[in-house]
Every structure is written in structure tokens, then in C-alpha cells.
């Protein structure tokens, strides 16, 4: 809550500052931690409902510029050490799109275009890479999503070597159907049948 307020104040004063938020921080509260489950251990830690509401408000108003995955996978044995001893972080990449659609787009917080801006165009602009748009002549790095396709998150199906997530078993909307890198289809999901067409994708 305080961070969003300070960022807003800094922007009003003309400071060159940007801010990001992760799907787990606008989806979960500290109340989700009901047992010694290190899949909920992340940095910053989960906060109150009031804090989550402020993050969502910041995204809607534009005070927060980006949605970032904060992808921090860990081996299963590392997260099994218990909440105190386990490392911080979760596998955020493979759930980020569906959580954003489910928690923000479907609830009217962001439009689909605003979601694309927060997750693609604006991050690319901030870090200075010529990506994040569908304009002619730009890099053909594209994700095609079915926003209405529902599925249940299953960490066992993750392509990442890290399977640590607090969202295992959560029903979400928004399935990635195709991933295109440099004009080449490298991933497809046809009615639940996933195919990684080319693991040796070009460097982004």
C-alpha cells in the first residue's frame, strides 16, 4: 500500500521511475499461507487484502507500469526444507498469462489491450528492446491466447524445470494456444494437447 502511494507521488513530481507487480502479488494474500508450505514463500512476501487492492488499483490507474513474472524456479527438494529454510521465489512464467486474464481482465480491471501493454509493450520499451508490438517490420515474437479457454493449473505439466507454485489446482481462464518466435511456431496447444515444436528457439 505504501509503495504504491510513494510511486504515485514520485511520478507526480516528475521523477523517472517505473514499477512492476507480479500475478502472485495481485492474486494472493497472506491468508493463503495456512501451513508450512514454502511454495508461498516469495520476496516481497504476501501482504493483506488491502495491500492487494492497492496493487490492483495501481495497475488500473497506470501508476504501476508492468506485470512481471518474477520467475524464480527452485528444485523440489529446496522447497521441501520448510517455510523458514527454503529459498524465496516461485515458478511464475507459465501461470502469469492465465492469472492476469482470470484476476484482472475477466474482472474488468484491465482490457485485453491494457494487459498486452503491461506484459509486453511497456516492459520492452522500459528496457530498450525493439519488441512488444505487432507493427510491420517488427520482430514476429507473438503469443496467441484463447482468453475463454478454462483449465486447471497442474505443475506436473510445466515445461520449466521448476515446479514450485502456490497455484497448483487453481482453475483459470486464458490458455496459450501458440507461441511464435522470429516468425516460427515453437509451441502449440490444440484442445489440451501440448506440443513443444522446437526447444532450440532463437535467443530473444
Which functions belong to the PLM regions below?
Residues 1-67:
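Histidine/acidic residue-rich metal-binding segments in metalloenzymes
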Residues 12, 33-36, 81, 106-109, ...:
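Short, glycine- and charge-enriched coil/turn segments that flank and shape catalytic ligand pockets
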Residues 20, 70, 100, 183:
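Residue-level signal for inorganic ion chemistry
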Residues 21-22, 71, 147, 170:
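Fold-independent oxyanion-binding glycine-rich loops
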Residues 26, 76, 152:
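Conserved protein kinase catalytic core
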Residues 39, 60-61, 66-67, 73-147:
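His/Asp/Glu-enriched, well-ordered alpha-helical/loop segment
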Residues 40-50, 89-91, 165-171:
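A short acidic, glycine-rich active-site loop
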Residues 82-85, 139-202:
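C-terminal cap of metal-dependent C-N hydrolases
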Amino acid at each position: 500500500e505504501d509503495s504504491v502511494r510513494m510511486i504515485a507521488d514520485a511520478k507526480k513530481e516528475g521523477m523517472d521511475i517505473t514499477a512492476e507487480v507480479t500475478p502472485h502479488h495481485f492474486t494472493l494474500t497472506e491468508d493463503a499461507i495456512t501451513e508450512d508450505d514454502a511454495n508461498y514463500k516469495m520476496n516481497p512476501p504476501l501482504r493483506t487484502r488491502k495491500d492487494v487492492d492497492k496493487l490492483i488499483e495501481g495497475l488500473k490507474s497506470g501508476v504501476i507500469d508492468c506485470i512481471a513474472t518474477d520467475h524464480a524456479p527452485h528444485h523440489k527438494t529446496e522447497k521441501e526444507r520448510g517455510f523458514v529454510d527454503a529459498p524465496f521465489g516461485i515458478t511464475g512464467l507459465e501461470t502469469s498469462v492465465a492469472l492476469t486474464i482470470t484476476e484482472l481482465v475477466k474482472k474488468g480491471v484491465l482490457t485485453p489491450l491494457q494487459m498486452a501493454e503491461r506484459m509486453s509493450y511497456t516492459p520492452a520499451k522500459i528496457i530498450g528492446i525493439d519488441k512488444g508490438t505487432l507493427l510491420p517490420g517488427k520482430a514476429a515474437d507473438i503469443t496467441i491466447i484463447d482468453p475463454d479457454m478454462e483449465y486447471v493449473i497442474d505443475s506436473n505439466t510445466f515445461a520449466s524445470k521448476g515446479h514450485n507454485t502456490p497455484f497448483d489446482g487453481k482453475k483459470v481462464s486464458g490458455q496459450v494456444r501458440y507461441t511464435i518466435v522470429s516468425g516460427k511456431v515453437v509451441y502449440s496447444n490444440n484442445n489440451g494437447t501440448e506440443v513443444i515444436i522446437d526447444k532450440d528457439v532463437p535467443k530473444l
